[in-house]
Amino acid sequence: MGSEMCIRDSTFPTWSLAQPFRVLAHNGEINTLKGNINWMSAHEPRITHSFFNERINDLKPILDPDASDSASLDAAFELFVQTDRDMPMAKSMIIPESWSNRSDLSDRLKAMYAYCNAVIEPWDGPAAVCGNFGDWIISGMDRNGLRPLRYILTDDDLLISGSEVGMINIDEKNIIKKGRVGPGELIAVNYKENKFYESFELKELLSKR
């Protein structure tokens, strides 16, 4: 299954901030950025992983205070996916949906989000993100849902996601599914399985781990 990421951004154009970054493209802004940078700095002395071993200090500081909010968000995602979390879990940890006072979520899903909240403080937008790493490509929204994010799935296994439906011309007869990604929601494709996941399917998958 193929995919296309298309994000429109208003950041002043410089090559070092060109999107997509290493694993993520981001439309919007991170209003909690200063707090997220401070929290990550506080966590850094405890960050360790066998993948990096003694070279873990080469990664620090994890977040560059001179980088854009989008570049900082990408760096946070990259840290998580390089240390054994896949993209759907990284999104659920870093940009979770609103969950604490919702009666429509299962206790198991709430427990998962409580775990995520214990690992890292949430990043709040408005933010729409698309990302790709390993077996997964994702497209998701922060819990505020104030940025447009739509998707199209075609009969030749192409997923297109971005801020506008008409960003790429697709014959209507080839579209088998289309819609919008709502506040806190996430859609994804697993390359290995060649499968498209809707938000409720990902929640079920992640909460069973």
Predicted segments, located by residue:
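N-terminal leader/propeptide and maturation segments of large enzyme subunits in energy/redox metabolism
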Residues: L59-L105
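Terminal amphipathic helices with adjacent charged low-complexity linkers/tails
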Residues: L33-F52, A188, E193-R209
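A glycine-rich phosphate-binding loop feature that marks nucleotide/adenosyl-phosphate handling sites
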Residues: S92-S100, N132-D135, L202-L205
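Flexible, small-/acidic-enriched active-site or ligand-binding loops
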Residues: T14-F21, I170-V181
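Catalytic or ion-translocation cores adjacent to nucleophile or general acid/base/metal-coordination motifs
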Residues: N31-L79, M112-Y115, C130, R150-K173
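Short, small-residue-biased leader/transition segments that mark boundaries at the very start
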Residues: M1, M5-C6
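Phosphate-interacting basic helix/loop segments used at nucleotide- and nucleic-acid interfaces
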Residues: D107-A127
